């Protein structure tokens, strides 16, 4: 009755927060129980029966295999699931100029079927979840990752394992601070390029992009709020004054205006190209650890777009299919040779 009433009053998306813990059973860990999946199936049946066809999104910050299970064996559970592995692996790839783990994950990630989608994001009001990186980043990778994030102003939140030892559950930091400096770019010369390219990958990837409000403006850590509250998540929960933000956006060269318009441009280009359809085919291409590359092909197979990202703080040489010479970069409409030399942390969207 609640679902039907809300849908009849205009609700089009139902987000099921931490739904994996819904069903409680004595003697179990009360996570991912079959009863929880059955309830989601029932909710899906209700949504499918309504004229407005509302969408169900499950929020399950878990290792990837468990997260994927919420599509249902017969695609009969959630319409969309959060792509939780993307944030830690994408951020790690830029900070360490290494596509190895991101590429492995991308190649293993199953394609979605029409009606199902990944909800892609790289920041939220919570921290950067680390459980979804399990199986891709080993202890040494994680230790170096945490060390760099802390150097950039981040904090770490922990979870207890079997009531005894503790593991990092999430890193609390804004994207602005996370991308600010790396071991290869200690002065932060290319932090803006890292920031925008990370969003370009997320927006171009198979699925539907979701951009955290504060990320639109390159918002930095709210250290003042964290000192007062002691809540690590407050680092990434800055509250804007509406009038102040609007005034900053009117200034062409303000930090907020620069970040905002660059990200808006990515969204504008995405909307114009059918190879960026949420279910358009995705193929990962191995171009060496300094490059992250994937190809999107439209559902009608008429448009192909290559996303080519230089993860390095140095110029890189990339050789693609010779047919690339007929392609253009969607950012500036320039034609490109199959021999590419992307700038430090530059992303190219090459379309036929």
Residues covered by each model-derived region:
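Active-site and adjacent substrate-binding regions of carbohydrate-active enzymes
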Residues: 1-325, 330-352
């Amino acid at each position: 009755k609640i679902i039907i009433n809300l849908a009849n009053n205009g609700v089009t998306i139902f987000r099921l927060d931490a739904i994996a813990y819904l069903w409680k059973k004595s003697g179990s860990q009360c996570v991912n129980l079959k009863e929880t999946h059955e309830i989601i199936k029932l909710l899906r049946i209700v949504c499918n029966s309504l004229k407005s066809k509302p969408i169900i999104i499950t929020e399950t910050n878990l290792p990837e295999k468990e997260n994927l299970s919420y599509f249902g064996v017969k695609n009969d559970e959630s319409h969309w699931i959060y792509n939780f592995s993307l944030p830690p692996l994408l951020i790690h790839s830029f900070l360490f100029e290494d596509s190895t783990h991101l590429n492995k994950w991308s190649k293993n990630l199953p394609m979605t079927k029409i009606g199902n989608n990944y909800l892609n994001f790289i920041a939220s009001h919570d921290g950067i979840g680390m459980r979804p990186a399990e199986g891709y980043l080993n202890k040494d990778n994680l230790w170096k990752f945490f060390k760099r994030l802390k150097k950039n102003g981040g904090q770490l939140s922990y979870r207890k394992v079997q009531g005894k030892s503790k593991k990092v559950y999430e890193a609390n930091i804004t994207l602005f601070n996370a991308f600010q400096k790396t071991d290869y770019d200690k002065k932060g010369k290319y932090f803006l390029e890292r920031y925008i390219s990370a969003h370009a990958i997320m927006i171009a990837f198979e699925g539907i992009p979701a951009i955290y409000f504060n990320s639109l403006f390159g918002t930095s850590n709210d250290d003042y709020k964290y000192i007062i509250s002691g809540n690590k998540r407050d680092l990434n929960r800055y509250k804007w004054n509406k009038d102040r933000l609007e005034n900053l956006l009117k200034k062409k060269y303000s930090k907020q205006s620069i970040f905002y318009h660059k990200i808006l441009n990515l969204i504008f280009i995405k909307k114009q190209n059918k190879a960026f359809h949420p279910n358009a085919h995705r193929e990962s291409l191995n171009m060496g650890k300094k490059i992250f590359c994937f190809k999107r092909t439209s559902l009608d197979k008429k448009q192909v777009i290559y996303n080519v990202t230089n993860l390095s703080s140095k110029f890189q040489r990339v050789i693609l299919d010779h047919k690339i010479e007929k392609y253009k970069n969607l950012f500036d409409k320039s034609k490109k040779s199959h021999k590419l030399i992307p700038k430090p942390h530059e992303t190219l969207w090459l379309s036929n």
